[in-house]
Amino acid sequence: MQEETFYSVRMRASMNGSHEDGGKHISGGERLIPFHEMKHTVNALLEKGLSHSRGKPDFMQIQFEEVYESIKTIQPLPVHTNEVSCPEEGQKLARLLLEKEGVSRDVIEKAYEQIPEWSDVRGAVLFDIHTGKRMDQTKEKGVRVSRMDWPDANFEKWALHSHVPAHSRIKEALALASKVSWHPAAVAELCWSDDPDYITGYVAGKKMGYQRITAMKEYGTEEGCRVFFIDGSNDVNTYIHDLEKQPILIEWEEDHDS
């Protein structure tokens, strides 16, 4: 599809030094854009990093690089919002949705037992649905999904059609979840934010799409979660490489999302 050159733009911000020096993660961002959008995109990422509710960063890195790989275009996952009254209800629903996506109850509980230990992991944890064990070797870094985006005009058209607020947070989360789910090794994703002011989370997968859950934690809580439940019989290193390096653009088509 690509005649235009695209660039991967990444931002990360932390407090009390860089992430490598043990600093507290404040904010991050990923964009995949043509060059003429560079200045606007960098400014938006700068603003995002400087105005996050997790704190004021004293370290920030914004970098961009040309993307040489062919860009794949995929559809966004279908979206459904589940209204719940409290985090306990939200977490109970999340477990049920994970089970419906093909993760056994035993493996779900094994993951939940370890989620508190993973609260400092900056990226995602890969968890095998067969063994109930963590598959990535990235420790506190986690796996960072990169090189994906959803062009604003198409996202806004989708949001209007789907009766969803055209908020950048939804755009970024759904673009990431759609890329994660697209790969054959993916079974399900469990996520809630480390932002103390944002309590909505989701379960995503191929069977039921992107299932938003309106309360997954209490306000003021800075512990987030991102777990990818995967079929470990696939090549895990290939999956990690694709998550980090394969460029993906989301493009919604109305007739596809009936």
Swiss-Prot record:
Cofactor: Mg(2+)
Domain of life: Bacteria
EC category: ligase
Keywords: ATP-binding, Biotin biosynthesis, Ligase, Magnesium, Nucleotide-binding
Catalytic activity: heptanedioate + ATP + CoA = 6-carboxyhexanoyl-CoA + AMP + diphosphate
GO molecular function: 6-carboxyhexanoate-CoA ligase activity; ATP binding; magnesium ion binding
EC number: 6.2.1.14
GO-annotated biological processes: biotin biosynthetic process
Pathway(s) it belongs to: Metabolic intermediate metabolism; pimeloyl-CoA biosynthesis; pimeloyl-CoA from pimelate: step 1/1
Protein family: Belongs to the BioW family.
Entry function: Catalyzes the transformation of pimelate into pimeloyl-CoA with concomitant hydrolysis of ATP to AMP.
Quaternary structure (record): Homodimer.
Name by which UniProt lists this protein: 6-carboxyhexanoate--CoA ligase
Organism, scientific name: Bacillus subtilis (strain BSn5)
Classification of source organism: Bacteria, Bacillati, Bacillota, Bacilli, Bacillales
